């Protein structure tokens, strides 16, 4: 109780933002929403400064930076290098770990702990509203296969996943 978390968003969010804010409230803490576009980040404040300063104010830094390949995870690691408090990935260009873990929890509740050879299908498609990040399907492929699931990903040919994370 009485903990403070900083939620830094580089793009819009509905479910991620509200689930983290609601979770902090339900646990007796407080979440501070930070829009990167209206904060000093937009004026060039470094990940080092963010990590050091926010560490002195609270108990956790949560970051969502997912739409620019090559930037999100790197930015989070830079903040974490300087922070004295946990830095949590709310979604980056490589992974959406909290959503992926929630999906895994739901699958285990429905199908049990032994997920060997369970077949799941994931679609990654066009949306007229905005570019769909690769982090959601990529995160599902990375995590679900570690639990022995057979994952099929349906996607347009020009939508490709990153090679390196899939090798891990």
List each language-model region with its residue ranges:
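Glycine-rich phosphate/diphosphate-binding loop of Rossmann-like nucleotide-binding domains
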Residues: 10-22, 109-168
């Amino acid at each position: 109780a009485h903990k403070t978390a900083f939620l830094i968003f580089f793009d819009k969010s509905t479910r991620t933002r509200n689930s983290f804010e609601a979770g902090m409230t339900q646990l007796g803490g407080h979440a501070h929403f930070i829009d990167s576009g209206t904060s000093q980040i937009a004026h060039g404040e470094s990940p080092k400064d963010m990590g050091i300063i926010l560490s002195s104010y609270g108990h956790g830094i949560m970051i969502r930076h997912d739409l620019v390949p090559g930037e999100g995870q790197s930015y989070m690691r830079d903040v974490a290098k300087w922070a004295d408090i946990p830095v949590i990935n709310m979604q980056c260009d490589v992974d959406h770990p909290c959503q992926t873990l929630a999906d895994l929890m739901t699958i285990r509740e429905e199908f049990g702990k032994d997920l060997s050879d369970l077949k799941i299908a994931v679609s990654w498609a066009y949306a007229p509203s905005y570019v769909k990040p690769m982090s959601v399907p990529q995160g599902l492929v990375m995590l679900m296969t570690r639990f022995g699931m057979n994952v099929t990903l349906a996607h347009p040919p020009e939508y490709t996943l990153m090679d390196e994370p899939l090798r891990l």
